[in-house]
Amino acid sequence: MAIASISEKIKDPRSKKRNLVMFLGLILLVAVLFISMIIGTANTSFSDLYNVFVGVQNTESYRILYHIRIPRVLTAMFAGINLAIAGCILQGVLKNPLADPGIIGVSAGAGLAAMIVMIILPEYTNMVPIVAFVGAMVATLILFALAWEEGIQPLKLILAGVAVSAFFAGGMTCLMVFFSDKIQGTVNWMAGGFSGASWKHVTMILPYTIIGLVGVSISSKLLNALQLGDDVAKSLGTRVEATRFFLVTLAALLAASAVSVAGMLTFVGLIVPHMMRLVVGSDFNYLLPSSAIFGGILLIVADTVARTAFSPIEVPVGVFMSFIGAPFFLYLLKRGMQKR
């Protein structure tokens, strides 16, 4: 039976299209990555970038590229990958196309926890991703408790997410009021962006991106099983509740890692899986990796536009994504209500 299913998959003409989409996506990701590194207020070229890679130092271009742009672009790529995977997983687990770490309050929980460390315990900034993960899990548990009624109800999930986000946003506002002398470094972080990103941020988020990419191969099979329904999934040997817990934990970890380095970025996990679902379909074997690829592309492009469009003024990426994502979210919400 396994051999037959593999044979069918090979013969399926859609698999060629899906593989082509991912291959072209990888090429586009590499191209966008390098182009973004040389674009900015200071003029640099591909030859300057090449000199950085071969170790030519002691030039102004080297300092700009190595210490500012390269770590910033890499951080944006990793954050985009993590948020897109997290959003795709949450949409699959909850069977809700509106699920996104930023919309349903997971990012807000991670943000409050991260902000507590950055303001009150700045000497422990290396612990920010772990603490943010704890905050994300707390938010997720509260969300499940509020939205559960013989299963997750989509409308209740959105309403509960708004309430959870408001609660944790209130906590962040309280921190800003009581520690107003220490918030200067966190204001831009709350708006969401990569200004000031360094190699420290790259090393902070990279391990979690690796975990996410490894988790993609495991998660895709589990998510495909869950789409068949609980009874069918159980008959196939899937431990449904344990699977849901594992997947939600993985999504919370990835969202928290992105929040810890980029702040409150919303809609990445909503937009990318939707766009890729239109292209590659609902098979998570293709949907998850393609979402990861194009999530990285989206945030690299968004960051590049945000820092260059109104130069020398830099628009926070979170603001830029909100202008794109909010209308898209309202469109999906309206379409979902019309179907009901």
Summary of predicted features, one role per range:
Residues 1-340:
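Alpha-helical transmembrane segments in inner-membrane proteins
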